């Protein structure tokens, strides 16, 4: 498994994510100083969408941010997170707990909406997708503070 970089160096007809991939990614997240590890699921940098697995552990810090050019869809595969929305002043406006064994398992957030997340359970893995090719966040997409 290649947790960083592209899923495969050649075109593939289909991909299956199994328990071993989730376990390996979780193992890497536990030893990562940021307490999270992403796995890029695109075929190449030219792919027109962003698709990734993100394994995380409690204590990981996700800054309050937004995406100008994309909505964001998150599916919880394992564990639990609290997805938090904020207003322009950094005040929490609402939140939802996504739980792989609970009521809410998927969230679609509109573009330009300030948000963050809190990992509530060890071994958590989410699937994220966004529109367009990957671009690092711009300075005005990360809230100071």
Report residues per predicted region.
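Short glycine/proline-enriched turns and hinge-like loops at secondary-structure junctions
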Residues: 66-68, 75-76, 119-122
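Short acidic-glycine-tyrosine-enriched beta hairpin
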Residues: 88-112
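Double-stranded beta-helix
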Residues: 16-17, 21-26, 91, 96-97, ...
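Short beta-strand His + acidic residue motifs that chelate non-heme Fe in jelly-roll/DSBH
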Residues: 64-65, 83-85, 106-109, 115-120, ...
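Conserved short histidine dyad/triad with adjacent acidic residue
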Residues: 53-69
């Amino acid at each position: 498994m290649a947790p960083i970089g592209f899923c495969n160096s050649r075109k593939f007809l289909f991909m299956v994510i199994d328990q071993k991939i989730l376990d390996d990614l979780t193992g890497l997240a536990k030893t990562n100083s940021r307490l999270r590890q992403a796995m890029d699921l695109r075929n190449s940098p030219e792919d027109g969408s962003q698709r990734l697995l993100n394994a995380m552990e409690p204590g990981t810090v996700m800054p309050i941010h937004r995406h100008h050019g994309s909505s964001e869809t998150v599916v919880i595969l394992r564990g639990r997170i609290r997805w938090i929305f904020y207003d322009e002043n950094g005040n929490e406006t609402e939140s939802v707990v996504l739980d792989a064994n609970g009521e809410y398992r998927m969230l679609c957030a509109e573009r330009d909406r300030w948000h963050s997340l809190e990992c509530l359970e060890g071994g958590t893995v989410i699937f994220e997708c966004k529109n367009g090719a990957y671009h690092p966040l711009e300075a005005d997409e990360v809230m100071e503070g």
